[in-house]
UniProtKB/Swiss-Prot annotation:
GO terms for molecular function: metal ion binding; ubiquinol-cytochrome-c reductase activity. PANTHER family: CYTOCHROME B. The gene is MT-CYB. InterPro entries: Cyt_b/b6_C, Cyt_b/b6_C_sf, Cyt_b/b6_N, Cytb/b6-like_sf, Cytochrome_b, Cytochrome_b_C_euk/bac, Cytochrome_b_N_euk/bac, Di-haem_cyt_TM. This is Cytochrome b.
Length: 380
Protein backbone atom coordinates (compact mmCIF):
# COMPACT_ATOMS: atom_id res chain seq x y z
CA UNK A 1 0.00 0.00 0.00
CA UNK A 2 1.36 3.45 -0.95
CA UNK A 3 2.30 5.72 1.95
CA UNK A 4 0.11 8.77 2.49
CA UNK A 5 2.33 11.68 1.40
CA UNK A 6 0.45 14.14 3.61
CA UNK A 7 1.32 12.12 6.72
CA UNK A 8 4.86 11.04 5.83
CA UNK A 9 6.56 13.86 3.90
CA UNK A 10 8.91 15.71 6.29
CA UNK A 11 7.41 19.15 5.63
CA UNK A 12 3.84 18.22 4.69
CA UNK A 13 3.39 16.24 7.89
CA UNK A 14 4.12 19.37 9.96
CA UNK A 15 1.40 21.23 8.05
CA UNK A 16 -0.86 18.18 8.35
CA UNK A 17 -0.43 17.98 12.13
CA UNK A 18 -1.09 21.71 12.52
CA UNK A 19 -3.96 22.32 10.08
CA UNK A 20 -5.55 19.05 8.95
CA UNK A 21 -5.34 16.13 11.39
CA UNK A 22 -4.98 18.37 14.46
CA UNK A 23 -7.29 17.07 17.23
CA UNK A 24 -9.50 19.99 18.26
CA UNK A 25 -12.18 20.27 20.99
CA UNK A 26 -15.67 19.68 19.59
CA UNK A 27 -17.25 22.67 21.34
CA UNK A 28 -15.00 25.69 20.66
CA UNK A 29 -17.07 28.75 19.76
CA UNK A 30 -16.56 31.64 17.34
CA UNK A 31 -14.29 33.26 19.97
CA UNK A 32 -11.71 30.68 18.89
CA UNK A 33 -11.76 32.03 15.31
CA UNK A 34 -9.64 35.08 16.07
CA UNK A 35 -6.32 33.23 16.08
CA UNK A 36 -6.72 32.27 12.43
CA UNK A 37 -8.13 35.74 11.63
CA UNK A 38 -4.92 37.23 13.07
CA UNK A 39 -2.97 34.92 10.73
CA UNK A 40 -4.96 36.27 7.76
CA UNK A 41 -4.40 39.86 8.96
CA UNK A 42 -0.65 39.20 9.16
CA UNK A 43 -0.51 37.73 5.63
CA UNK A 44 -2.63 40.61 4.24
CA UNK A 45 -0.43 43.21 5.95
CA UNK A 46 2.81 41.62 4.70
CA UNK A 47 1.54 41.36 1.10
CA UNK A 48 0.10 44.91 0.95
CA UNK A 49 3.10 46.27 2.88
CA UNK A 50 5.55 44.68 0.44
CA UNK A 51 3.69 46.24 -2.50
CA UNK A 52 3.74 49.65 -0.76
CA UNK A 53 7.45 49.35 0.07
CA UNK A 54 8.17 49.00 -3.66
CA UNK A 55 6.91 52.55 -4.21
CA UNK A 56 7.78 54.23 -0.89
CA UNK A 57 10.82 56.47 -0.36
CA UNK A 58 12.18 56.69 3.20
CA UNK A 59 13.39 60.28 3.03
CA UNK A 60 11.95 63.28 4.86
CA UNK A 61 11.77 65.31 1.64
CA UNK A 62 10.09 62.57 -0.38
CA UNK A 63 8.14 60.31 2.02
CA UNK A 64 4.90 62.32 2.01
CA UNK A 65 5.02 62.83 -1.78
CA UNK A 66 5.81 59.16 -2.40
CA UNK A 67 2.68 58.13 -0.48
CA UNK A 68 0.59 60.67 -2.43
CA UNK A 69 2.16 59.41 -5.69
CA UNK A 70 1.20 55.84 -4.74
CA UNK A 71 -2.42 56.82 -4.24
CA UNK A 72 -2.60 58.84 -7.47
CA UNK A 73 -0.31 57.18 -10.01
CA UNK A 74 0.24 53.54 -9.05
CA UNK A 75 -2.30 51.00 -10.37
CA UNK A 76 -4.65 50.32 -7.43
CA UNK A 77 -2.12 52.03 -5.15
CA UNK A 78 -4.96 53.81 -3.32
CA UNK A 79 -6.60 50.44 -2.61
CA UNK A 80 -3.37 48.81 -1.43
CA UNK A 81 -2.68 51.73 0.90
CA UNK A 82 -6.23 51.80 2.27
CA UNK A 83 -6.21 48.03 2.84
CA UNK A 84 -2.86 48.31 4.64
CA UNK A 85 -3.88 51.24 6.85
CA UNK A 86 -7.27 49.76 7.77
CA UNK A 87 -5.83 46.24 7.94
CA UNK A 88 -3.83 47.46 10.94
CA UNK A 89 -7.09 48.46 12.66
CA UNK A 90 -8.59 45.02 12.01
CA UNK A 91 -5.37 43.40 13.25
CA UNK A 92 -5.80 45.21 16.57
CA UNK A 93 -9.55 44.53 16.79
CA UNK A 94 -8.80 40.82 16.33
CA UNK A 95 -5.89 40.75 18.80
CA UNK A 96 -7.88 42.57 21.50
CA UNK A 97 -10.83 40.17 21.06
CA UNK A 98 -8.36 37.24 21.07
CA UNK A 99 -6.83 38.45 24.36
CA UNK A 100 -10.30 39.08 25.81
CA UNK A 101 -11.24 35.50 24.94
CA UNK A 102 -8.06 34.29 26.65
CA UNK A 103 -8.86 36.24 29.82
CA UNK A 104 -12.49 35.11 29.94
CA UNK A 105 -11.92 31.41 29.34
CA UNK A 106 -8.68 31.04 31.33
CA UNK A 107 -6.57 30.26 28.25
CA UNK A 108 -3.70 32.07 30.00
CA UNK A 109 -3.12 28.92 32.05
CA UNK A 110 -1.25 27.62 28.98
CA UNK A 111 1.58 29.79 30.31
CA UNK A 112 4.11 29.48 27.47
CA UNK A 113 1.49 30.12 24.79
CA UNK A 114 0.17 33.13 26.74
CA UNK A 115 3.60 34.67 27.37
CA UNK A 116 4.60 34.36 23.72
CA UNK A 117 1.22 35.92 22.87
CA UNK A 118 1.95 38.96 25.07
CA UNK A 119 5.35 39.33 23.38
CA UNK A 120 3.50 39.14 20.04
CA UNK A 121 1.21 41.97 21.18
CA UNK A 122 4.25 44.11 22.08
CA UNK A 123 5.85 43.35 18.69
CA UNK A 124 2.60 44.29 16.91
CA UNK A 125 2.36 47.56 18.84
CA UNK A 126 5.97 48.41 17.96
CA UNK A 127 5.34 47.60 14.29
CA UNK A 128 2.18 49.73 14.15
CA UNK A 129 3.93 52.64 15.88
CA UNK A 130 6.92 52.77 13.50
CA UNK A 131 4.58 52.23 10.54
CA UNK A 132 2.43 55.21 11.50
CA UNK A 133 5.49 57.47 11.26
CA UNK A 134 6.28 56.53 7.64
CA UNK A 135 3.76 58.73 5.72
CA UNK A 136 5.51 61.70 7.40
CA UNK A 137 2.37 63.73 8.02
CA UNK A 138 1.93 66.05 11.00
CA UNK A 139 0.57 63.36 13.34
CA UNK A 140 3.25 60.91 12.16
CA UNK A 141 6.00 63.36 13.07
CA UNK A 142 4.58 64.60 16.36
CA UNK A 143 3.45 61.13 17.43
CA UNK A 144 7.01 59.90 16.86
CA UNK A 145 8.43 62.89 18.75
CA UNK A 146 6.13 62.51 21.77
CA UNK A 147 6.35 58.73 22.14
CA UNK A 148 10.12 58.38 21.58
CA UNK A 149 10.63 61.29 23.99
CA UNK A 150 9.10 59.17 26.76
CA UNK A 151 12.33 57.15 26.90
CA UNK A 152 14.07 60.29 28.18
CA UNK A 153 12.19 59.71 31.46
CA UNK A 154 14.47 56.73 32.15
CA UNK A 155 16.90 57.95 34.83
CA UNK A 156 20.55 58.59 33.93
CA UNK A 157 20.57 57.02 30.43
CA UNK A 158 17.24 58.43 29.16
CA UNK A 159 18.42 61.42 27.13
CA UNK A 160 21.32 59.50 25.58
CA UNK A 161 18.96 56.65 24.72
CA UNK A 162 16.50 58.98 22.95
CA UNK A 163 19.21 60.71 20.91
CA UNK A 164 20.59 57.30 19.98
CA UNK A 165 17.13 56.15 18.85
CA UNK A 166 16.60 59.38 16.87
CA UNK A 167 20.05 59.32 15.30
CA UNK A 168 20.35 63.04 16.10
CA UNK A 169 18.91 65.75 18.34
CA UNK A 170 15.36 65.54 16.99
CA UNK A 171 13.13 63.29 14.88
CA UNK A 172 14.62 63.72 11.40
CA UNK A 173 15.82 61.83 8.33
CA UNK A 174 17.87 59.17 10.22
CA UNK A 175 14.81 58.46 12.40
CA UNK A 176 12.55 57.95 9.37
CA UNK A 177 15.10 55.69 7.66
CA UNK A 178 15.52 53.41 10.67
CA UNK A 179 11.78 53.33 11.34
CA UNK A 180 11.24 52.11 7.77
CA UNK A 181 13.90 49.42 8.27
CA UNK A 182 12.24 48.34 11.55
CA UNK A 183 8.77 48.41 10.00
CA UNK A 184 10.01 46.08 7.27
CA UNK A 185 11.76 43.74 9.72
CA UNK A 186 9.26 43.41 12.58
CA UNK A 187 6.44 41.63 10.68
CA UNK A 188 8.86 38.78 9.95
CA UNK A 189 9.76 38.67 13.64
CA UNK A 190 6.00 38.42 14.27
CA UNK A 191 5.78 35.49 11.81
CA UNK A 192 8.56 33.70 13.73
CA UNK A 193 6.92 34.37 17.10
CA UNK A 194 3.58 33.16 15.69
CA UNK A 195 5.17 29.80 14.85
CA UNK A 196 6.53 29.59 18.42
CA UNK A 197 3.05 30.54 19.73
CA UNK A 198 1.45 27.73 17.68
CA UNK A 199 4.14 25.23 18.67
CA UNK A 200 3.42 25.83 22.36
CA UNK A 201 -0.36 25.74 21.71
CA UNK A 202 -0.15 22.37 19.96
CA UNK A 203 1.77 20.92 22.93
CA UNK A 204 -1.35 21.23 25.09
CA UNK A 205 -4.13 21.63 22.52
CA UNK A 206 -6.82 24.31 22.57
CA UNK A 207 -8.78 25.24 25.65
CA UNK A 208 -12.60 25.22 25.31
CA UNK A 209 -15.55 27.29 26.63
CA UNK A 210 -16.15 24.95 29.57
CA UNK A 211 -12.50 25.13 30.67
CA UNK A 212 -12.39 21.34 31.17
CA UNK A 213 -10.09 18.75 29.50
CA UNK A 214 -11.50 17.71 26.13
CA UNK A 215 -9.18 14.79 25.30
CA UNK A 216 -12.10 12.36 25.38
CA UNK A 217 -14.00 14.25 22.68
CA UNK A 218 -11.76 15.59 19.90
CA UNK A 219 -12.60 16.16 16.25
CA UNK A 220 -10.19 16.69 13.32
CA UNK A 221 -9.44 20.33 12.49
CA UNK A 222 -10.22 19.66 8.81
CA UNK A 223 -12.99 19.83 7.59
CA UNK A 224 -14.81 21.15 10.68
CA UNK A 225 -12.72 24.14 11.70
CA UNK A 226 -11.26 24.85 8.26
CA UNK A 227 -14.81 25.57 7.06
CA UNK A 228 -15.56 27.58 10.20
CA UNK A 229 -12.34 29.60 9.72
CA UNK A 230 -13.11 30.27 6.05
CA UNK A 231 -16.47 31.75 7.11
CA UNK A 232 -14.57 33.99 9.55
CA UNK A 233 -12.13 35.05 6.80
CA UNK A 234 -15.00 35.92 4.46
CA UNK A 235 -16.77 38.02 7.11
CA UNK A 236 -13.63 39.87 8.21
CA UNK A 237 -12.29 40.50 4.71
CA UNK A 238 -15.69 41.78 3.55
CA UNK A 239 -15.72 44.22 6.50
CA UNK A 240 -12.13 45.29 5.76
CA UNK A 241 -12.81 45.80 2.05
CA UNK A 242 -16.02 47.72 2.84
CA UNK A 243 -14.14 50.05 5.19
CA UNK A 244 -11.25 50.50 2.75
CA UNK A 245 -13.61 51.28 -0.16
CA UNK A 246 -16.40 53.29 1.48
CA UNK A 247 -14.73 55.15 4.34
CA UNK A 248 -10.95 54.66 4.19
CA UNK A 249 -10.12 57.69 6.37
CA UNK A 250 -12.73 57.07 9.06
CA UNK A 251 -10.18 55.90 11.65
CA UNK A 252 -7.31 58.15 10.54
CA UNK A 253 -6.39 61.63 11.76
CA UNK A 254 -7.06 64.53 9.34
CA UNK A 255 -3.87 66.15 10.69
CA UNK A 256 -1.90 63.51 8.75
CA UNK A 257 -2.96 65.04 5.41
CA UNK A 258 -0.58 67.92 6.23
CA UNK A 259 3.13 67.23 5.60
CA UNK A 260 5.28 67.07 8.76
CA UNK A 261 6.34 70.49 10.03
CA UNK A 262 8.65 70.64 13.09
CA UNK A 263 7.69 74.32 13.61
CA UNK A 264 3.92 73.77 13.97
CA UNK A 265 2.53 71.58 16.74
CA UNK A 266 -0.96 70.11 16.12
CA UNK A 267 -3.57 71.22 18.72
CA UNK A 268 -4.21 67.65 19.94
CA UNK A 269 -1.47 65.07 19.56
CA UNK A 270 -3.00 61.61 19.79
CA UNK A 271 -2.09 58.16 18.47
CA UNK A 272 -4.26 55.85 16.36
CA UNK A 273 -7.41 54.58 18.12
CA UNK A 274 -5.88 51.22 19.07
CA UNK A 275 -3.31 52.89 21.37
CA UNK A 276 -5.70 55.37 22.99
CA UNK A 277 -6.43 53.24 26.10
CA UNK A 278 -2.69 53.04 26.89
CA UNK A 279 -2.23 56.72 25.99
CA UNK A 280 -5.01 57.66 28.44
CA UNK A 281 -3.24 55.71 31.20
CA UNK A 282 0.05 57.46 30.32
CA UNK A 283 -1.60 60.92 30.46
CA UNK A 284 -3.49 60.30 33.68
CA UNK A 285 -0.30 60.34 35.79
CA UNK A 286 1.06 63.88 36.24
CA UNK A 287 4.68 62.70 36.31
CA UNK A 288 6.74 61.73 33.27
CA UNK A 289 8.47 58.65 34.66
CA UNK A 290 5.32 57.54 36.50
CA UNK A 291 3.32 57.83 33.30
CA UNK A 292 5.86 55.81 31.33
CA UNK A 293 5.84 53.07 34.00
CA UNK A 294 2.02 53.00 34.01
CA UNK A 295 2.01 52.82 30.20
CA UNK A 296 4.39 49.84 30.27
CA UNK A 297 2.44 48.22 33.12
CA UNK A 298 -0.86 48.51 31.21
CA UNK A 299 0.41 45.87 28.77
CA UNK A 300 2.96 44.00 30.92
CA UNK A 301 0.25 43.30 33.53
CA UNK A 302 -0.92 40.57 31.12
CA UNK A 303 2.20 38.56 32.06
CA UNK A 304 0.85 38.38 35.62
CA UNK A 305 -2.60 36.97 34.84
CA UNK A 306 -1.54 33.29 35.13
CA UNK A 307 -0.04 34.04 38.57
CA UNK A 308 -3.18 35.85 39.77
CA UNK A 309 -5.54 32.97 38.93
CA UNK A 310 -6.99 31.87 42.28
CA UNK A 311 -10.13 30.09 41.05
CA UNK A 312 -10.49 26.30 41.08
CA UNK A 313 -12.40 26.67 37.79
CA UNK A 314 -10.47 27.57 34.67
CA UNK A 315 -13.08 29.45 32.68
CA UNK A 316 -15.47 32.23 33.75
CA UNK A 317 -18.43 30.33 32.22
CA UNK A 318 -19.73 29.33 35.67
CA UNK A 319 -18.38 32.31 37.65
CA UNK A 320 -20.94 35.16 37.63
CA UNK A 321 -18.94 37.53 39.90
CA UNK A 322 -15.85 37.28 37.71
CA UNK A 323 -18.05 37.75 34.64
CA UNK A 324 -19.38 41.04 36.03
CA UNK A 325 -15.80 42.18 36.70
CA UNK A 326 -14.68 41.07 33.24
CA UNK A 327 -17.37 43.11 31.46
CA UNK A 328 -16.66 46.05 33.79
CA UNK A 329 -13.03 45.82 32.64
CA UNK A 330 -14.14 45.81 28.99
CA UNK A 331 -16.31 48.91 29.58
CA UNK A 332 -13.40 50.49 31.45
CA UNK A 333 -11.01 49.97 28.51
CA UNK A 334 -13.60 51.52 26.18
CA UNK A 335 -13.86 54.54 28.52
CA UNK A 336 -10.05 54.85 28.52
CA UNK A 337 -10.06 54.70 24.70
CA UNK A 338 -12.61 57.52 24.56
CA UNK A 339 -10.79 59.65 27.17
CA UNK A 340 -7.50 59.20 25.29
CA UNK A 341 -9.06 60.89 22.26
CA UNK A 342 -10.24 63.93 24.28
CA UNK A 343 -8.22 67.07 25.15
CA UNK A 344 -6.46 67.26 28.53
CA UNK A 345 -9.02 69.30 30.48
CA UNK A 346 -11.79 68.89 33.05
CA UNK A 347 -13.67 66.46 33.28
CA UNK A 348 -11.55 64.17 31.07
CA UNK A 349 -8.52 64.31 33.39
CA UNK A 350 -10.37 62.93 36.41
CA UNK A 351 -12.32 60.39 34.32
CA UNK A 352 -9.02 59.15 32.88
CA UNK A 353 -7.43 58.89 36.33
CA UNK A 354 -10.39 56.95 37.75
CA UNK A 355 -10.52 54.64 34.72
CA UNK A 356 -6.75 54.02 34.94
CA UNK A 357 -7.02 53.19 38.63
CA UNK A 358 -10.00 50.88 37.97
CA UNK A 359 -8.09 49.12 35.17
CA UNK A 360 -5.26 48.02 37.47
CA UNK A 361 -7.54 47.44 40.48
CA UNK A 362 -9.80 45.05 38.56
CA UNK A 363 -6.93 43.03 37.08
CA UNK A 364 -4.57 42.94 40.09
CA UNK A 365 -6.96 42.93 43.07
CA UNK A 366 -10.62 42.30 42.24
CA UNK A 367 -10.19 39.34 39.85
CA UNK A 368 -8.20 37.24 42.39
CA UNK A 369 -10.54 38.25 45.26
CA UNK A 370 -13.72 37.45 43.30
CA UNK A 371 -12.30 34.08 42.26
CA UNK A 372 -11.39 33.20 45.86
CA UNK A 373 -14.88 34.23 47.01
CA UNK A 374 -16.48 32.10 44.28
CA UNK A 375 -14.43 29.10 45.43
CA UNK A 376 -15.98 29.57 48.88
CA UNK A 377 -19.53 30.10 47.59
CA UNK A 378 -19.29 27.04 45.34
CA UNK A 379 -17.66 25.05 48.21
CA UNK A 380 -14.74 24.07 45.95
Amino acid sequence: MALNLRKNHQILKIINNALIDLPAPSNISTWWNFGSLLGICLITQIVTGLLLAMHYTADTNLAFSSVAHMCRDVQFGWLIRNLHANGASFFFICIYLHIGRGLYYGSYLNKETWNVGVILLLALMATAFVGYVLPWGQMSFWGATVITNLFSAIPYIGQTLVEWAWGGFSVDNPTLTRFFALHFLLPFVIVGLTLVHLTFLHETGSNNPLGIPSDCDKIPFHPYYTIKDILGFALMLSLLVSLALFSPNLLGDPENFTPANPLVTPPHIKPEWYFLFAYAILRSIPNKLGGVLALAASILVLFLTPLLHTSKLRSMTFRPLSQILFWTLVANVLILTWVGSQPVEHPFIIIGQLASLSYFTIILILFPLAAALENKLLKL
